[in-house]
Amino acid sequence: MKMVLSQRQREELNQAIADYLGSNGYADSLETFRKEADLSTESEKKYGGLLEKKWTSVIRLQKKVMDLEAKLTEAEKEVIEGAPTKNKRTPGEWIPRPPEKYSLTGHRASITRVIFHPIFGLMVSASEDATIKIWDFETGEYERSLKGHTDSVQDVAFDAQGKLLASCSADLSIKLWDFQQSYECVKTMHGHDHNVSSVAFVPAGDYVLSASRDRTIKMWEVATGYCVKTYTGHREWVRMVRVHIEGSIFATCSNDHTIRVWLTNSKDCKVELRDHEHTVECIAWAPEAAASAINEAAGADNKKGHHQGPFLASGSRDKTIRIWDVSVGLCLLTLNGHDNWVRGLAFHPGGKYLVSASDDKTIRVWDLRNKRCMKTLYAHQHFCTSIDFHKAHPYVISGSVDQSVKVWECR
């Protein structure tokens, strides 16, 4: 369909083109264009930069149109499938939906971890570029970078109050950062013999746990920076450590295909979980709110009795997600659907859903009660490496090998 410009619009466009040619040094083209368009040699100031402004406006409008089209497609799909619409969903049913609210760039290498601050409207990303970046997830604004590591930053974790940030790196160190005022590194701990792959605070905040490729887990005293315990038992690289909210136990997963649950106050392994067929990349403790959905799903699979938990989810390179009752060492559910390694897990605060990130470039939302994938988001251009679900606000964040961090609104 041919677009017809009015005489005034045609004159403005010609003046804007002339300004663009002149300001970019295309003198010969400008002279020819002025003759053919019958323009004076003087250009008015109001046309300065007009062509660029129009062009960027078109791009912005195009993105808004694409976002609206994605939301419309989403709404139409829900109507067809009979899913509850936004107005009928309770906050406990809100899940991440496309398109992303923000796509944040600035890192120069793969994103290894993304986490929310427990109190403020901030999030943190760690990267193989050896930096940690802080962002405002509500506005999408970049705040600052934390620099000090000399190799890939593998994991980050906040204490319960969000006053301290712990980070660990392939440079064999664990660092503690003041997250209240200075944003400076206040302690550096050394003791591992290989890549430090994961960190986690115990709930009281007085100790930090670290997991390493040297096959050990270490406990560090925050006040002194001293290593006070070393836990051994895994036969290969320990990929992740996560502490239960009560603090008395923590879980680790490994390249040896197992998950171990440890007693925090001793060096004893409480239980070893052994059903995965490949490296276990990630783990996540289920909130208490998830117990009823997990029990209902387990009941459908004839897993006898009412399970008390605690419950733990694990994601593996075997492309499966498993949910365990760690008190009895039993796998209650297996979730199949990803086409590649499962790299990140996060429970919905309401307990009904689990979200996962995978090397198949997707984020999937799992309905625990029905043991099915209810939503697939084609989230990134490359492997999805990490995911987090905010405990109080309707947001999910994801990180990727494509060097971007994305913020997803739940509705």
UniProtKB/Swiss-Prot annotation:
Transmembrane segments: none annotated. Its main location: cytoplasm. The gene is Lis-1. The lineage of its organism: Eukaryota, Metazoa, Ecdysozoa, Arthropoda, Hexapoda. It is found in: Cytoplasm, Cytoskeleton; Cytoplasm, Cytoskeleton, Microtubule organizing center, Centrosome. InterPro entries: Dynein_regulator_LIS1, G-protein_beta_WD-40_rep, LIS1_N, LisH, PAC1-like_LisH-like_dom, WD40/YVTN_repeat-like_dom_sf, WD40_repeat_CS, WD40_repeat_dom_sf. This is Lissencephaly-1 homolog. One of its GO terms (cellular component) is dendrite. GO terms for molecular function: dynein complex binding. Keywords: Cell cycle, Cell division, Coiled coil, Cytoplasm, Cytoskeleton, Microtubule, Mitosis, Repeat, Transport, WD repeat. Signal peptide: none annotated. One of its GO terms (biological process) is nuclear migration along microtubule. Belongs to the WD repeat LIS1/nudF family. Residues 9-41 form the LisH domain. WD repeats lie at residues 106-147, 148-187, 191-230, 233-272, 275-334, 337-376, 379-411. Dimerization mediated by the LisH domain may be required to activate dynein.
